[in-house]
Amino acid sequence: MKHNSLKFLFIAASISIGLSSCDGYLDQMPSNALPSDESINNIEDVGSALNGVYSGLLSSEYYGADFISRAEVGGEDVQTSTPSKRTENFYKFMYRQNNAPTGLWKIPYQVINRVNVLLQAIESGKITASPQLDNAKGEALAVRALCNFNLNIVYGYPYQKDKGASLGAPIVEKVLTANDMPARNTVAEGYEAIEKDLTTALGLVSDKVNDGHFNKWAVLGLQARVYLYKGNYDAAFNCAETIIKESPYKLIQNADYLAAWSNEYTSESVSYTHLTLPTIA
């Protein structure tokens, strides 16, 4: 009997040790990844992270297709061919539990999280201050404003319906954990956050042309659009007029219009994204 008791005690102790070892083993970070707070340590890392921010905009569930086609086929500009797996639900407005387009919510928040990881690293003080770093921070803030703007367009009533009193999308300005469940903010709160990010970005970004990236003129262009949706027409006009009068961008002349389509960027390309992103300037 004593022998059996010792045997059971030994087995129980072995299980306990095994479970403790297992816990430690399962807590290990993957060998092919870094924690977000350790992955951005210098200006080169900042450039790579910023390119990752922009690449998220190009998802087929965002600017790569769905965000554009949703508006086009939802109005009267474009009629979808049937059957069309990508645009038919938008065109017919046939949203069910098993086919509702979740990407228009998921992808912008993925991009926002990338922005917040980058901003957390920049604001930690561990990266040497420089104009490059300021510019990268400004670009990241502008992208976050763009994503928040789009989320409120899709998931909130137009601002002018009730001065933004109705619910829109949650404002996320920090790196989230798996347990975080931010509540929806009002549309007015969303616009306030958008305008704050754009105002800060405007004081940080360069005024030089860097195709595929936000600069001063692209931020002003987004500000103009935000003010237009908000009904602040004087402010929208002022932003647009500044771009027209002071920026290096010019309208293409009639004689050059057809040839311009053979180029990825033109003198009119104030705010564009592209598939192969250059490093930050």
Segments and roles (model prediction):
Residues 1-20:
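Sec-dependent bacterial lipoprotein signal peptides
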Residues 85-155, 185, 203-207:
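Conserved, well-structured interaction surfaces
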